[in-house]
A protein has these predicted regions:
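C-terminal ends and interior cores of transmembrane alpha-helices
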Residues: 81-110, 307-328
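Intracellular juxtamembrane helix-capping segments at the cytosolic ends
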Residues: 130-144, 346-362
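Central cavity-lining transmembrane alpha-helices of secondary-active solute carriers
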Residues: 47-68, 276-288, 378-381
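Extracytoplasmic gate region of multi-pass secondary transporters
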Residues: 30-31, 230-276, 280
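Helix-loop-helix hairpin linking two adjacent transmembrane segments in secondary transporters
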Residues: 149-209
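Extracytoplasmic
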Residues: 11-39, 132-136, 251-259
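C-terminal transmembrane helical hairpin of 12-TM major facilitator-type secondary transporters
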Residues: 299-353
């Protein structure tokens, strides 16, 4: 009986790790897909990403409530069904609606398939929000909590970074160079892979027994949220996480756009490769952090990476485009490599900000986690704002927005993360 339960848990752990990877896979489709839609509609490059992350604003708290009401297993199953529907809608946009004009924007006719794609991106956003709510606590629980639970989360996080690296790379290979003939059908293999993994994961989770924790009374959730927001360092941390997700997504997305828009043969593939290198840098950063986190404080790590990120961004902004090097047979501005290197810095920011922001919250930590999940919407809003700036100026100038956000995170690390509300009872 014990052996059967152990085998069941192993299958569930492997499945959760793959789902952890799929969260990043689905999320990071936004930039390469944005290249396709942005070529046809110059205003739409970041809209899919915006819809994907806007879902967090509406689904963050409901996901937590759903988790308490129906448990891990049923929430995960529901999320996978939602994900399949979202990916199917995105595929539908490649075969239907291109010849059906719905309205005009700035004198440009807008076809129905764009709206179908955006709906699919929103639905996928609901999916990844629900999965994010499930995967971390489920892996921790399956590991028995403590160090073993954290180890499983780190394994899942590594796979998450790996798929974040591969997604823009695969999309770039499939597309090559974005032209007027490029469409969503060119990247349909990615959508089919996603749907297949979700379907297989659904079947596995359905038949695997997963222990459900006792969540207790959830009626005081809103009161807990109000209590959590009494802490200044949490409020400042919530703003920091909002900016962080915008930074994490915005840097590689606009790096991809910048290189792709150079328009040479294979520019989309090279743009995807450079964006993938950013995510690979994040993978290296997360792996390296596991060895130093026990010796160096979170505040010190955050201060260092924020400062280095500012230096890399300023170097990328001020370095002339004429300073270039050959990369895969083409002259590429050196500044793009400074942008890709920022992945080393952003790799530890999510965990670092969360750790500093919830320090000393006690019973309010769970409510704070729900608030944090809502603020992931920054990954849609801030890259969209960066895209607006890029359209009115240029791609590199838009990185001043990222500089401002990183500067705020440096402020939070040095000053804003200090708990000045120790008089509030948390037990």
């Amino acid at each position: 009986m014990t052996q059967t339960k152990s085998n069941s848990n192993i299958v569930a752990i492997i499945t959760m790790c793959f789902i952890f990877a799929m969260i990043s896979f689905v999320t990071n489709m936004g930039a390469p897909f944005g290249n396709i839609w942005g070529f046809k509609y110059d205003f739409a490059a970041s809209w899919g990403n915006l819809m994907n992350f806007t879902a967090y604003l509406f689904m963050g708290i409901p996901s937590g409530m759903l988790l308490k009401k129906i448990g891990y297993k049923k929430t995960a199953l529901a999320a996978l069904v939602v994900g399949i529907i979202g990916l199917a809608l995105q595929y539908l946009s490649s075969i239907y609606g291109d010849d059906i004009k719905v309205n005009e924007m700035n004198g440009q006719p807008i076809a129905l398939n764009l709206y179908i794609y955006l709906l699919g991106a929103l639905v996928c956003g609901f999916c990844v929000c629900m999965l994010n709510t499930v995967v971390n606590p489920m892996l921790n629980m399956l590991g028995g909590g403590g160090n073993k639970g954290n180890q499983l989360i780190q394994v899942g996080g590594t796979l998450n970074s790996l798929t974040a690296t591969l997604t823009p790379l695969l999309a770039g290979v499939l597309v090559g160079t974005v032209t007027e003939n490029t469409s969503m059908s060119d990247v349909s293999p990615l959508l089919f892979i996603g749907m297949a993994v979700f379907a297989i994961s659904f079947c596995i989770i359905y038949f695997v027994t997963i222990p459900e924790p006792n969540f207790g009374d959830s009626g005081s959730l809103m009161d807990s949220m109000k209590g959590a927001l009494r802490f200044r360092h949490l409020v400042l941390g919530v703003i920091a996480i909002f900016f962080y997700v915008g930074i994490e997504i915005g840097i590689p997305m606009h790096l991809n756009f910048y290189v792709t828009n150079m328009g040479f043969e294979g520019s989309a593939a090279i743009g995807g490769t450079l964006a993938a290198s950013y995510w690979f840098m994040m993978l290296i950063g997360r792996f390296s952090s596991t060895f130093i986190s026990g010796k160096v404080s979170t505040r010190a790590q955050m201060t260092v990476v924020s400062t280095v990120a500012l230096c890399l961004l300023l170097a990328a902004i001020f370095l002339p485009e004429s300073v270039a090097t050959e990369f895969q047979g083409h002259e590429i501005p050196v500044k793009v490599f400074f942008l890709a290197a920022c992945g080393l810095c952003t790799s530890i920011m999510w965990g670092g900000i969360f750790n500093l922001a919830v320090e000393g919250l006690g019973k309010y930590t769970e409510a704070a986690s729900g608030i944090f999940m809502m603020m992931v919407v920054g990954g849609g809003l801030m890259p969209w704002l960066q895209d607006v700036i890029a359209k009115s100026t240029d791609s590199i100038t838009s990185y001043w927005l990222v500089v401002a956000m990183v500067a705020y995170i440096l402020f939070f690390s040095l000053v804003g993360s200090k708990n000045v509300n120790k008089d509030i009872k948390v037990d």
